[in-house]
Each structure stands twice: as structure tokens, then as C-alpha cells.
Amino acid sequence: MGVEIQSPQEQSSYTVEQLVALNPFNPEILPDLENYVNVTSQTYSLEVNLCLLRLYQFEPERMNTHIVARILVKALMAMPTPDFSLCLFLIPERVQMEEQFKSLIVLSHYLETGRFQQFWDEAAKNRHILEAVPGFEQAIQAYASHLLSLSYQKVPRSVLAEAVNMDGASLDKFIEQQVTNSGWIVEKEGGSIVLPQNEFNHPELKKNTGENVPLEHIARIFPILG
């Protein structure tokens, strides 16, 4: 038995997430989903965005490329999740060939490969697309910091500056915030930043499963080997 389609009056009493759960293939919810993507606050739901892109597949004449671009920008902000690739899979190839989408795909590649200097250079050429979404720069700076913390035990100030696209007083303030909130340490000599230890930048912290095999399991192996 199919899900009953609510009237517009009934739909207005639901949240966007509930509408997606109840009527994911109902084109009548398209305006609600588009409004959700367009809001200026930093709202984000992968499920809502994927639902909207699927509905565009069924109703191609109603596709709003401005909305699609906004979805992809928000997906970039969700790095290191695979959201960008998941959304891109639902966008027709003919749409992907438009300049704004080609630029977003290039930006995604730079982020995934940690090529931050190239990313910020390309981003500067596409500010009209990226700055339409609040918090974009801050989200990418957080991702860059996360990626550095997985790769390095210590980074020179110059490397951090390139990754987060900051310098001078703004970089000083950013580092101070990370010292307070994320446990960064600034060396007195040289000013390099010591990043918190984790199992990626300090492999010795990663638990060796072989060391945790219960003794009784080992005892059972010896008769078999004999």
C-alpha cells in the first residue's frame, strides 16, 4: 500500500525532513525543499538535498541550476564526508558541463587531494558562487585543519597559512582559537604548531588487534598447530 500524499495544507505542518520521509517522490514538495536549500542560515541535510536532486531527475523541466550549485557548495562544506560525490552522481552530465559546475568539481578535487593553495586560487575566481552560502570559508578552514592534524605532528606556520588562506593578525587569531579549543601548541622558537596526537599522526597510538587476542583463543590454536 503506497504512502498517502498530503495536501499542501497538511504538508505545511511538517518539517522538511518529515516531508522527505513521508513523500520522497512527490513533486509537490519541490518548493519546500528548494526553500530549505535557499535559507541563509547554515542548515544542511544530505537526505533533503539528495531527495531534491532525485525529484529534479523526474522533473527535469523544473530543475533550478542555482539551487543545484548551492547544494554542491554545501556538500563541499561537509568535507571530509563523501556528500559531494553522492550529490554529483544525481546531476545530469549535461548540467555538469556548465562552467559553474565544472569549477565546483575542480574545487572538490583540490580539497580531496589536499591541494589547498590551488583550491583557494580557484575559489577566488568563483566567489559569486561560493559566498552565496554563509560560512563557506570557515567550513573549509576547519576541514584543512582537520586534514593537517591527520597528516602531521607539527606544521610550520607558513604551511598552515597556505592551508587556511590566512596571514597576519587573522592567522594569529585563528591559531589562538585552536590553541584554546583544539589543544594546539605553538612552539616558542620558530612558531611551528604542534598538533594533538591521534592514531593517524602518531601510528603507535593505534591499537594492535593482535595484542588483544584473548589467551584462551591462543591456547586453542596450539593443538591445531601440533
Curated annotation (Swiss-Prot):
- Domain (PCI) ranges: 44-202
Assign the protein's first listed, main location to one coarse class: cytoplasm
- InterPro entries annotated for this entry? ARM-type_fold (IPR016024), CSN8_PSD8_EIF3K (IPR033464), eIF3k (IPR009374), PCI_dom (IPR000717), Transl_init_fac_sub12_N_euk (IPR016020), WH-like_DNA-bd_sf (IPR036388), WH_DNA-bd_sf (IPR036390)
Question: Where is it located?
Answer: Cytoplasm
User: Which keywords has UniProt assigned to this entry?
Assistant: Cytoplasm, Initiation factor, Protein biosynthesis
MF annotations from Gene Ontology:
ribosome binding; RNA binding; translation initiation factor activity
Would the keyword Ribonucleoprotein turn up in this protein's UniProt record? no
Q: Does the keyword Protein biosynthesis apply?
A: yes
| Biological-process GO terms, alphabetical | formation of cytoplasmic translation initiation complex; regulation of translational initiation
A Gene Ontology cellular-component term: eukaryotic 43S preinitiation complex
PROSITE patterns annotated for this entry? PCI
PANTHER family per UniProt: EUKARYOTIC TRANSLATION INITIATION FACTOR 3 SUBUNIT 11, EUKARYOTIC TRANSLATION INITIATION FACTOR 3 SUBUNIT K
Q: How does it assemble?
A: Component of the eukaryotic translation initiation factor 3 (eIF-3) complex.
HAMAP family noted in UniProt: eIF3k
- Describe its function: Component of the eukaryotic translation initiation factor 3 (eIF-3) complex, which is involved in protein synthesis of a specialized repertoire of mRNAs and, together with other initiation factors, stimulates binding of mRNA and methionyl-tRNAi to the 40S ribosome. The eIF-3 complex specifically targets and initiates translation of a subset of mRNAs involved in cell proliferation.
Q: Which family does it belong to?
A: Belongs to the eIF-3 subunit K family.
**What name has this protein been given in UniProt?**
Eukaryotic translation initiation factor 3 subunit K
- The organism named in the record is Arabidopsis thaliana (Mouse-ear cress)
